[in-house]
Every structure is written in C-alpha cells, then in structure tokens.
C-alpha cells in the first residue's frame, strides 16, 4: 500500500486556508496535486468548480453508484505565532504528525486517496464515487451540496456515504441539525429615574475550553449573555446598552458588558431602551424554549445567543440552535415564546437544506464499519458528533451515512496533529469497509 504519511505530508504543505473574512480561498495547487495523483493511477477523476471553489470528483469500479467516499481539503485559518511548529511544514514528533489540517481533514483525504488506488485495482461490481471538496469549513454549499445536486440530477445517488470528517475512531452515526433563530426588536426609548450600573460577564468552561456553540454544556458552562439576562431580570433593571465579543453565530462571546439602570424614585434621569430591555430579559427564557424533536440526541438541545447587533431602528439577536428537529417545529416553538415575551418582535429561522443525521446503530453501514474495526483490532466507539458535517446534505435523500476519522488533537486550534499509527491504519479501514459493502 502507498505511504499515506507521505501523501498527508504533501497535502499539509499546501496552505489551503478558507477565510471569507479576508477573501481567502484554497489555492488550486492542492486540487492539482490530488487530481494528478489519482490520474497517475488511471482513476477516473474530474475537477468541478462552483463560485470559485473546486472539488475533485470521480469514481472507481463499474455499474451503478453504490458507495461514496467524501472528505475536504480546506482548513481553518491559523495563527502561526501560537504554534510550536510551522503549521504548513509537516513535522513528525513522537509519533505525531503536526500541521494545519493534519486531523481536520487532510488525514482523511490522504487515507481515501490511498484507499482509492487499492480499490481501483480490483474488479468492483458496483461504482464507488469519491469527492474531495474545498468549502466544508465555510458551509459546504459549493462543494458537497454542489456535488449532491449533480448526483440527484443524474439519478446517481449512492446507497452509502462514508464521510471522512470525524476523529478519534468514533463511528459517528448521529448529528443534530443547525439553525439560526433571528429575533428583531424595535428600539423604544424612555427616560426613567434610577441608579446606573455596569457589569461585565465572561464565558466560563470549567471542564473543557472550546467557545464553540456545538460543545456548550448548559448545566456546566457559563454564557455571558445569559448571565446578563438573569442579572437584569433579578434587578428589575432597564438596559441602556449591550456590548460584547460577538464574532459569529456559532462562537460563544468571550465577554458581554451590560449597562443598566435600577429604578429609584430619587435617582438620576436616564434614557433607557425598553425594546433592548425586553430582548435581554427574554434571553434566559429563550434558551430554555421547549422544542419538539424527531429523534434522540445524547447532546439534547443546544440554544446559545451568540450574536447581537443594532442599527438606527432595531436590535437583532441571533440564537444558534442545534436539535434533531425541523425548521417548522422550531419556528412554532420559538414563535410561541417570543409572542408571549416580546409580541412586537419579528422572528425568522435560517437553516440550510441539509437534515439531521440519524443512521441507526443496527444499520448495515454501521455494522460493517464495526466488523472491520474489530477485525483490524482497532479500538473505537459508536456515537454522536457535536458539530455539523457535509453528511447532512445527503440524509434527506435517505442515503445511509457515517463520519469517521483518525486519532489526533488540536482540531481548529494550535499544534494540530494526527497520530501516525492511527493514520497508517485508516486507508485499510476505508478499503475494507467499501469491499464489505460491495460484497
């Protein structure tokens, strides 16, 4: 079998960063490398483009499409000053290969590339599709979704999807769907008498540091905006302003500062915002909105208020919601709460066309995966992933999906790495799973 460590090292050396804020997209160089690598072994491969993002797409075998391998080569931005090693110079230390994308997700790209070479040498009675995309870190619309639409239009959907976008040998068969609930409240000013106050709250994670909405634990972690909401309710105060480190809808703000006025008959006259006051008071109730679900999740329902902005006329709060539910059920639940607390508010729900992932543990795909891992002596678990992946685009079409990946650490953080022994086993895992599914 080919040297997967060498292939991954080559992939890491391409700085395929996706950073829309700075207008940075992955360069074509890594696409060319993947294309030429696969082509050199006689594999049928094409490059697809959508909105400036490139996907390497092709197949091995013959007959009807049956199994698909999927992974992404784009990576998140990096602060090189915080790394012990050059993030784009693969560095092998104590059995770990360091580099941006070593775990997420170039280890899977490399493993699948090597696996495809082996599979291409066999007489496969059904077709194995593959795709390596360049926009997973920014939503997947121009990569996985673009390819899905192509497959749907050609009536070429596979029965099974193996998405190499997991980690630590977890056979991920469940993932919640992600929504953004947008609440707009008009500004409404009034002068009141009272005592001014100001309070800054910080996010606190006593168990694990993350700042990602997918990993927020409501009964353990402390969200600064929720704390501010409870303070205002308990004081019976009016809000004059809210400021904070509001970055993205899926990132917990590190700090939130609330300026308020506690009513006092002999206090100073202060102009307050009644609309903002209602909105902030509502936060601590909104995050407990009872949402009907369609399937079990070990993470339950996560609701975090992570983005706030205002303009001349209104305040806008965006809640990150993760649940095994539908857009319609979610809207009904939040609309009931908003109508009760802030009847003048407007509410919208944003989401993509993907669904939640809920492949049964007794499905053929999961069973085959676990059989292969057992046969290879690989320690594993079967469970749920907290975040989203491109698998979600395929589930509405009844494609059985699982996510998987090698052992490693530092995903989206500093000193990202993959365990080399785990990496070396990965191509064999993918090859054996595909062969068993085709048998």
Residue map of PLM features:
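Redox- and metal-dependent alpha/beta enzyme cores, enriched for Fe-S-associated oxidoreductases
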Residues: 329-347
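Zn-dependent metallopeptidase/amidohydrolase metal-coordination segment
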Residues: 249, 308-322, 348-353, 367-437
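Midchain, well-structured core segments that form catalytic/ion-binding scaffolds
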Residues: 152-328
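Acidic/His- and Gly-rich active-site-bordering loop/insert found
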Residues: 1-100, 119-126
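Short glycine/serine- and small hydrophobic-enriched flexible loop segments
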Residues: 114-121, 229-234, 432-435
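Short pre-catalytic strand/loop immediately N-terminal to key active-site residues, enriched for Gly-Thr
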Residues: 93-104, 378-381, 413-414
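Active-site-adjacent substrate-binding region
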Residues: 216-243, 281-291, 356-397, 401
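Acidic/histidine-rich catalytic neighborhood of metal-dependent amide-processing enzymes
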Residues: 106-188
């Amino acid at each position: 079998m080919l040297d997967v460590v060498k292939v991954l090292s080559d992939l890491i050396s391409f700085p395929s960063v996706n950073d829309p804020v700075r207008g940075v997209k992955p360069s074509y160089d890594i696409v060319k490398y993947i294309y030429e690598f696969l082509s050199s072994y006689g594999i049928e491969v094409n490059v697809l483009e959508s909105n400036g993002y490139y996907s390497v797409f092709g197949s091995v075998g013959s007959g009807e499409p049956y199994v698909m391998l999927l992974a992404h080569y784009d990576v998140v931005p990096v602060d090189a000053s915080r790394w012990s090693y050059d993030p784009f110079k693969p560095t092998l230390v104590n059995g770990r290969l360091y580099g941006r994308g070593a775990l997420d997700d170039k280890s899977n790209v490399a493993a699948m590339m090597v696996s495809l070479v082996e599979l291409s040498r066999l007489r496969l009675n059904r077709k194995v599709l593959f795709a390596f995309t360049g926009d997973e870190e920014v939503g997947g619309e121009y990569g996985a979704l673009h390819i899905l639409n192509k497959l749907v239009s050609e009536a070429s959907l596979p029965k099974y999807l193996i998405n190499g976008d997991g980690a630590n040998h977890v056979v991920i068969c469940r993932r919640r769907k992600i929504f953004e609930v947008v609440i707009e409240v008009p500004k409404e000013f009034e002068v009141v008498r009272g005592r001014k106050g100001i309070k800054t709250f910080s996010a606190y994670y006593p168990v694990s540091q993350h700042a990602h909405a997918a990993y927020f634990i409501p009964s353990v972690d402390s969200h600064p905006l929720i704390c501010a909401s409870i303070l205002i309710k308990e004081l019976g105060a009016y809000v004059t302003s809210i400021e904070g480190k509001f970055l993205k809808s899926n990132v917990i703000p590190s700090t939130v500062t609330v300026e308020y006025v506690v009513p006092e008959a002999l206090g100073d006259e202060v102009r307050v915002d009644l609309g903002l006051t209602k909105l902030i008071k509502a936060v601590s109730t909104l995050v407990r909105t009872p949402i009907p679900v369609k399937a079990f999740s070990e993470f339950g329902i996560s609701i975090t208020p992570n983005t706030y902005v205002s303009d001349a006329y209104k305040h806008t709060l965006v809640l990150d919601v993760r649940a095994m539910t539908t857009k319609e059920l979610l809207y009904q639940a939040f609309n009931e709460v908003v109508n009760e607390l802030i009847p003048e508010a407007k509410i919208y729900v944003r989401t993509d066309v993907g669904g939640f992932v809920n492949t049964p543990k007794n499905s053929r795909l999961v069973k085959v995966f676990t059989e292969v891992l057992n046969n290879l002596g690989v320690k594993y678990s079967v469970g749920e992933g907290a975040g989203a992946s491109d698998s979600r685009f395929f589930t509405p079409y009844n494609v059985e999906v699982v996510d998987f990946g090698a052992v490693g650490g530092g995903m989206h953080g500093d000193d990202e790495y993959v365990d080399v022994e785990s990496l070396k086993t990965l191509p064999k895992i993918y090859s054996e799973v595909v062969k068993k599914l085709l048998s």
